[in-house]
Amino acid sequence: MQQLSKRRLSALFVTAFLPVTAFASECSSVRFAEVGWTDITVTTALASEVLEALGYEPRVDTVSVPIAYAGIRNNDFDVFLGNWMPSMASISDPYIERGEVERLVANLEGAKYTLAVPQYVYDAGVTSVNDLAEHADQFEQRIHGIEAGNDGNEL
């Protein structure tokens, strides 16, 4: 009687975990959307190393922010680690509100956009935003933003 119970228990144990192992075999790769920014490249590389050590096969594709979100919605990507909040709200919130993308946790809080100039421009007198108007001709009255489609260009 004791042996029969062990067999049944073993069968129950194996049966209970079959769906889990089937699911795990379907999830052997993790597809990252990455936007080519130094910080996100490093964050994605670190996450990829950890996942490789756990037996997963990470794949990283460099795309723009809008394509990253559309790719998650379309199941082309699993993860995007470059969501800057609140500055990316205009891109991410519609996907989140429709339940197409889930924001799990923040890996960077309080992110903001700001202007930067090369040292030679700073040395020429552009040390704050207020100096831009005075030197506007040197910049053809233009400020260049980040990649196309990024909401930071709207600021």
From Swiss-Prot:
GO terms for molecular function: transmembrane transporter activity. One of its GO terms (cellular component) is ATP-binding cassette (ABC) transporter complex. Keywords: Signal. The keyword Transmembrane helix does not apply. SUPFAM superfamilies: Periplasmic binding protein-like II. The keyword Signal applies. Residues 1-24 form the signal peptide. This is Uncharacterized protein ORF1. It comes from Chromohalobacter salexigens (strain ATCC BAA-138 / DSM 3043 / CIP 106854 / NCIMB 13768 / 1H11).
